[in-house]
């Protein structure tokens, strides 16, 4: 089976490298060509354009937002125009529910397969093959690519036959993680203002009721006040909150916390923090409490 991979940012590069390490026949493409070389060194073939990647049987994409995905997939020289009938596009990007539905319909009209498979996990998990795959699409297509998911992740969750529902689940999960980050920041600011060491407080939390990776990883970043390099940049968190709110409006679901989080990301960006890790919103409560400048 020939594979293609488009989008070699920190997440995509780690995922593509996993396929190289598993000795798959892989062709890669990225708009910034300098990102190709590390994968070529690992055994991948570099493509000059999207059409060359689309000679593959399965093409993965890992792109940053709706605009990038629309350009790469629906553009005149994109995946839709070049993927052969029967081949499969697996989109691992975190995009809007509405765009995922459009992609599904567009691929269907061309007799091309489409699976939405956004992931939970940061770049270190991608490089280690420890992602959680959130997949939705036709059962026969998912069965065909499941061995590939096993290369990328420690577990695959199949949520629906409708691809866009995987994106709804992913966005809902990111909303929940952002809620945890903000809550951790607020709680740490409260105890610190009251004279309790924030690292000691975090150790108490993660050694008792909150011994889970989200609290441990992001809690440490907030307590250390160290948000670089960004595993997931704050401007992408802001983008995701907009997508969450758009999905909520479409489904007539009130999400007051999502509106607050959107404002927090906007506040962080206004103070020059859009490229910090998204956990930097957890520092805003300390700033509001005059604990840090």
Regions found by a protein language model. Give the residues of each.
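Helical "substrate-binding/catalytic lid" subdomain
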Residues: 163-288
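NAD(P)+-binding Rossmann beta1-loop-alpha1 motif at the extreme N-terminus of oxidoreductases
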Residues: 1-62, 87, 123, 155
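Rossmann-fold dinucleotide-binding core
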Residues: 94-175
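Hydrophobic residues within alpha-helices
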Residues: 15-16, 103, 148, 190
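Rossmann-fold NAD(P) dinucleotide-binding segment
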Residues: 50-113
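Hydrophobic beta-strand scaffold residues
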Residues: 26, 46, 114-115, 156, ...
């Amino acid at each position: 089976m020939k594979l293609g991979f488009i989008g070699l940012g920190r997440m995509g590069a780690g995922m593509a490298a996993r396929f190289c390490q598993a000795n798959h026949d892989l062709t890669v493409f990225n708009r910034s060509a300098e990102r190709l070389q590390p994968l070529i060194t690992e055994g991948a073939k570099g493509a000059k354009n999207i059409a060359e990647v689309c000679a593959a049987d399965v093409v993965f994409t890992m792109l940053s937002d709706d605009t990038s995905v629309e350009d790469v997939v629906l553009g005149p020289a994109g995946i839709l125009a070049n993927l052969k009938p029967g081949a499969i596009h697996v989109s691992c990007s975190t995009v809007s529910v509405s765009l995922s539905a459009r992609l599904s319909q567009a691929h269907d009209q061309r007799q091309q397969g489409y699976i939405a498979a956004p992931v939970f996990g940061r770049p270190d998990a991608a490089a280690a093959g420890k992602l959680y795959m959130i997949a939705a699409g036709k059962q026969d297509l998912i069965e065909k690519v499941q061995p590939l998911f096993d290369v990328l992740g420690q577990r695959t969750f199949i949520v629906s036959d409708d691809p866009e529902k995987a994106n709804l689940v992913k966005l809902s999960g990111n909303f929940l993680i952002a809620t945890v980050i903000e809550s951790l920041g607020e709680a740490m600011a409260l105890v610190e203002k009251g004279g309790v060491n924030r690292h000691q407080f975090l150790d108490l939390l993660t050694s008792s009721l909150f011994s889970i990776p989200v609290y441990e990883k992001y809690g440490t970043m907030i307590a250390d006040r160290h948000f670089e390099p960004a595993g997931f940049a704050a401007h992408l968190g802001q983008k995701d909150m907009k997508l969450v709110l758009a999905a909520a409006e479409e489904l007539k679901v009130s999400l007051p916390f999502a509106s607050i989080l959107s404002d927090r990301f906007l506040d962080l960006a206004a103070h020059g923090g859009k490229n910090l890790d998204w956990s930097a919103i957890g520092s805003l409560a300390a700033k509001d409490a005059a604990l840090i400048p």
